[in-house]
Amino acid sequence: LGGYIIMKRKALAITLAAAMAMGTCAVTASAADGDKYTIGICQLVQHEALDAATQGFKDEVTKELGEDAVTFDEQNAQGDSNTCSTIINSFVSNNVDLILANATPALQAAAAGTSDIPILGTSVTEYGVALGLDDFDGTVGGNISGTADLAPLDQQAAMLNELFPDAKNVGLLYCSAEANSQYQVDTVKAELEKLGYTCEYYAFSDSNDLSSVATTATDASDVIYVPTDNTVASNTEIINNICLPAKVPVITGEEGICSGCGVATLSISYYDLGV
């Protein structure tokens, strides 16, 4: 598979000092004057990719500011977007200096929760889709900035074609509740159809119907494609237990999902994404 297994790509590099300078609470990233900062971290759910992004962020902030200059209030929403809103509201009430919103629902909750506290998003595939920005040009503006985990979707399609040139039917398996997953499968579908594949959507609403939808997709497909998707990332064992015995290969949108149920991916490094 050569260089097709993992491709690291850091996107939208940001300095902490610049991010903290946005909005009304301007901050200089220097611990020399004795300032102490509180950073609220809202992570949608615990899985390998999001954990790595959070850890990369914490490591870099600690390196830049010093261990004694920053306190992290780290909260996990357990996959519930409503809990994201509750967490963000607590950060706003506590007047934290910065919010790290890890994953799209966390970013959406943060954007709705405050226009004053600086927000950094991470593990967000497409900010325009996430925030409903029709004319998104790569800059959100206001108090929001961040890093994107959008993989090279055209190259993922090309990789699938290189690995499985004789396949005809590709099943696109994704969570319909995740807007960025829809964006990815739409893009990959268009690329695969250019290459002559027949593609079919297999959307599940949550983890409860993943098994039945994955089974249907496996029965009808030569290859399965799953995008960068938080529900998939938390339930790779379900997919693996269905696709592996059926000998239907799975191409994935990121490294953590690939390690759980896939055969190949082109992926960013989520640790680097958080840095």
Residues covered by each model-derived region:
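Structural motif
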Residues: 71-93, 203-219
